[in-house]
Amino acid sequence: MPAMLTDVFRGHPIHLPHSHIPDFTSLRELPDSYKWTPKDDLLFSAAPSPPATGENIPLIDLDHPDATNQIGHACRTWGAFQISNHGVPLGLLQDIEFLTGSLFGLPVQRKLKSARSETGVSGYGVARIASFFNKQMWSEGFTITGSPLNDFRKLWPQHHLNYCDIVEEYEEHMKKLASKLMWLALNSLGVSEEDIEWASLSSDLNWAQAALQLNHYPVCPEPDRAMGLAAHTDSTLLTILYQNNTAGLQVFRDDLGWVTVPPFPGSLVVNVGDLFHILSNGLFKSVLHRARVNQTRARLSVAFLWGPQSDIKISPVPKLVSPVESPLYQSVTWKEYLRTKATHFNKALSMIRNHREE
């Protein structure tokens, strides 16, 4: 990430106990600090969608002739979808999964050599959203912004260059895919490149930036009382998630409650982020999601968090705003929005909404 965006985190340091991350494999009982109740998160016990409904986020074949409309419909109704035939080699997905498993399989003290600082973005630690909750989450993460060389050298003195190559190749594929998906979704609304000059599909994508988030949700002795990653929306345009074959990701829909997203081999999950919600004037839904944990199987995921450069103003596309109404949201840069999110968390979107109801 450019320095400007990194400065947001320096200006909002969070005091998270990275050094107190336990050796999850040694815990046979769930510590009280990891036991969640509805008091800790109002949506913790929200009713899950009954399996009989058969409702789930769509799996979209990007080679399907109607993929554009299918993606648009998914963004409007779910705020999330899965994709196949996405062009990312299966071998590369296997490589990034192997890297992620290798990293989190290291001894805790080795991982702490690359711990994220209070004012930093990159490195090992707990989720930044942990500061908004009283209870701890049953997970560990590793954030990559820019080159991971220095951090990886601390973790793997002998093999860090190979792992850096995997990350670089993965990010290159993700950047192209994210831009393609954004434009497929916007095209479904009749939006063209003439309407958003800063995001040309034919450019070298220098208008965008991203972070890579590696996540590990260890086996948990009491999964029904624990939380892997608490409910939140992403501050991105789009997030592209690769998950191994262990279920745990859940998305929330008002009429269904929590819906578990089943892993399909080789597929990727795409989440609409807050900035895409703003850009679409609220037509595309920024999806509330969380991660639950498992008693018998660990879960790994890799999230590509994608958005614009720090100085690009994001505002509703004029074509999507009624001539007799004002845009639903104020114009905001990613840098400005992250500041708002750092203070107001899941209420951040409502804070920049025009004509807020008091």
Swiss-Prot record:
Positions of the catalytic residues: 299
Record carries keyword Metal-binding: yes
GO annotation, biological process: gibberellic acid mediated signaling pathway; gibberellin biosynthetic process; response to gibberellin; response to red light; response to red or far red light
Induction: Inhibited by GA3, indicating the existence of a probable feedback loop. Inhibited by dihydro gibberellins. Regulated by phytochrome. Induced sharply after red light pulse with a peak at 4 hours, and then decreases rapidly as germination occurs. Increases again when etiolated seedling growth begins. Not regulated by long day exposure or auxin. Up-regulated by cold treatment, paclobutrazol and uniconazole P.
One Pfam family cited in the UniProt record for this chain: DIOX_N
Effect of pH on activity: Optimum pH is 7.5.
EC top class, as a word: oxidoreductase
SUPFAM superfamilies (UniProt xref): Clavaminate synthase-like
Domain Fe2OG dioxygenase: from-to ranges: 204-308
InterPro entries reported for this sequence: DIOX_N (IPR026992), IPNS-like_FE2OG_OXY (IPR044861), IPNS-like_sf (IPR027443), Iron_ascorbate_oxido_reductase (IPR050231), Oxoglu/Fe-dep_dioxygenase_dom (IPR005123)
PROSITE patterns, alphabetized: FE2OG_OXY
E.C. designation(s): 1.14.11.15
A molecular function GO annotation: metal ion binding
Cofactor entry: L-ascorbate; Fe cation
Catalytic activity: gibberellin A9 + 2-oxoglutarate + O2 = gibberellin A4 + succinate + CO2; gibberellin A20 + 2-oxoglutarate + O2 = gibberellin A1 + succinate + CO2
Entry function: Converts the inactive gibberellin (GA) precursors GA9 and GA20 into the bioactives gibberellins GA4 and GA1, respectively. Involved in the production of bioactive GA for vegetative growth and development.
Name of the protein in its database record: Gibberellin 3-beta-dioxygenase 1
Gene: GA3OX1
